[in-house]
């Protein structure tokens, strides 16, 4: 019987993988004569091979039609953003009218808070996790100040209460219950960027809405990583980026979800002409008539060249399906966890929760001996063509992405850790 932690077993798993051919749909950076062993899809996804042709299609249409490309040609720019809408909805578990690709994550977060953070004298607090991504914290604090409120009194932070710096569901529930009468908004991540912890979003939404608070999600590390059910969960809004697991390129256009119950609401918003209903947009009337659904929060015409790579990537998600991607992801990350425990337990400590339901593909790792040794291992891996990433103060993040990573890649990683430890 083959050793389940051997390279031979990994090769057999790769050969039996129903998604194995998707790897060929991506361009890999090179290390010498070989592909890099790339575990950084949680920071920047690889380039889909089809992206170049789709960008060229836009460039060719621009060259051939100039301004007329907005209304004629194979992919009219007037409605180009809608070419990704249905596929995006499938990835995040939404109805098509609930999603739009626009702006960037932090811009969209501000737009959503302008509509959904409506503080009153009694209810003005915003609840976040204490380890929130800095841009989210900056956005929240600035929104509080715009309303004349002090973050010291109106920003509620849920501290990590588990040994590895993760947050229990009971701590979240307790904080929502304790501050419920004063909460205007709960803003929570789908996955914590440093620890890799995934959260029970449906339960967080239920608890927050029961207290009368609006609920928003930052899905930067969850979209394309976990199956999501935003419509059924009832979240008010969600924002995310497309340059990580959605492979749309550096600085890619962001994504936004607004629940269907708000599709035709009179919520105040920061308005722009591309959010005006499409049928009358070019009449240039002074009165703003919003498009129904998430498209009504658009400001300017979409960046068509930036949307083209997203189209290429979403076609691969449709080909694979989120359920199949998640099944492979659980296998990959579980296999990596087993190998770390079996072969390098004296070197690496896994920060990320062990339960598959509480993590995505990423494992966050600490190196025994502290930060200096952690940096030394990180730099050794990089020099060997094994790319993870580093998050201060002391975490190496390794994210096996099911679209393009193999079980044999995990062995390359562990073998390099062993080589470094033995040196």
From Swiss-Prot:
Enzyme class: hydrolase
Entry keyword set: Hydrolase, Pyridine nucleotide biosynthesis, Pyridoxal phosphate
Swiss-Prot/TrEMBL cofactor(s): pyridoxal 5'-phosphate
GO cellular component: cytoplasm
E.C. code: 3.7.1.3
Entries under Pfam families matching the protein: KYNU_C
Keyword NAD: no
Catalytic activity annotation: L-kynurenine + H2O = anthranilate + L-alanine + H(+); 3-hydroxy-L-kynurenine + H2O = 3-hydroxyanthranilate + L-alanine + H(+)
Record-listed N6-(pyridoxal phosphate)lysine modification sites: 244
A biological process term (GO) from this entry: L-kynurenine catabolic process
InterPro entries: Kynureninase, PyrdxlP-dep_Trfase, PyrdxlP-dep_Trfase_major, PyrdxlP-dep_Trfase_small
Gene Ontology MF annotations: kynureninase activity; pyridoxal phosphate binding
Pathway: Amino-acid degradation; L-kynurenine degradation; L-alanine and anthranilate from L-kynurenine: step 1/1; Cofactor biosynthesis; NAD(+) biosynthesis; quinolinate from L-kynurenine: step 2/3
Binding site for pyridoxal 5'-phosphate: 105-106, 133-136, 218, 221, 243, 273, 301
HAMAP family: Kynureninase
Quaternary structure and partners: Homodimer.
Family designation: Belongs to the kynureninase family.
Function, as annotated: Catalyzes the cleavage of L-kynurenine (L-Kyn) and L-3-hydroxykynurenine (L-3OHKyn) into anthranilic acid (AA) and 3-hydroxyanthranilic acid (3-OHAA), respectively.
Protein name, per record: Kynureninase
Provenance organism: Xanthomonas axonopodis pv. citri (strain 306)
Organism classification: Bacteria, Pseudomonadati, Pseudomonadota, Gammaproteobacteria, Lysobacterales
């Amino acid at each position: 019987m083959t050793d389940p932690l051997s390279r031979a077993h990994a090769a057999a798993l790769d050969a039996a993988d129903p998604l194995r051919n998707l790897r060929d749909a991506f361009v890999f950076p090179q290390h010498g004569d070989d592909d890099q062993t790339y575990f950084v899809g949680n920071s920047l996804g690889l380039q889909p091979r089809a992206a170049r042709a789709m960008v060229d299609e836009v460039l060719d249409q621009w060259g051939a039609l100039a301004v007329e490309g907005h209304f004629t040609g194979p992919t009219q720019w007037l409605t180009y953003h809608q070419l990704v809408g249905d596929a995006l909805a499938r990835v995040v578990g939404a109805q098509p009218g609930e999603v739009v690709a626009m702006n960037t994550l932090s811009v969209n977060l501000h737009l959503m808070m302008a509509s959904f953070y409506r503080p009153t004298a009694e209810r003005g607090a915003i609840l976040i996790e204490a380890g929130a991504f800095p841009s989210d914290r900056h956005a929240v604090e600035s929104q509080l100040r715009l309303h004349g409120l002090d973050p010291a009194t109106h920003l509620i932070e849920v501290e990590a209460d588990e040994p590895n710096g993760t947050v229990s569901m009971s701590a979240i529930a307790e904080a929502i219950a304790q501050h419920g009468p004063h909460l205007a908004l709960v803003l929570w991540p789908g996955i914590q960027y440093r620890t890799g912890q995934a959260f029970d979003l449906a339960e967080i939404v239920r608890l927050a809405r029961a207290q009368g608070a609006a609920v928003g999600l930052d899905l930067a590390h969850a979209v394309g990583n976990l199956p999501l059910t935003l419509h059924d969960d009832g979240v008010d809004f969600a924002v995310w980026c497309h340059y990580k697991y959605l492979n749309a390129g550096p600085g890619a256009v962001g994504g936004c979800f607004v629940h269907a119950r708000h599709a035709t609401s009179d919520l105040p918003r920061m308005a722009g002409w591309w959010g005006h209903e499409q049928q009358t947009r070019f009449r240039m009337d002074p009165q703003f008539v919003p498009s129904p659904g998430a498209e009504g929060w658009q400001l300017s015409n979409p960046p068509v060249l930036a949307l083209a790579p997203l189209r290429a990537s979403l076609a691969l998600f449709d080909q694979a399906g989120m359920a199949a991607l998640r099944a492979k992801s659980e296998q990959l990350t579980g296999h990596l966890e087993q190998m770390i425990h079996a072969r390098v337990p004296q070197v690496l400590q896994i920060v990320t929760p062990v339960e598959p339901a509480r993590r995505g593909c990423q494992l966050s790792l600490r190196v025994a001996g502290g930060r200096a040794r952690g940096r030394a291992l990180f730099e050794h891996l990089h020099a060997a063509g094994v790319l993870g990433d580093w998050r201060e103060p002391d975490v190496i993040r390794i994210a096996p992405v099911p679209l393009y990573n193999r079980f044999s890649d995990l062995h390359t990683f562990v073998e390099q850790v062993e080589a470094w430890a033995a040196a």
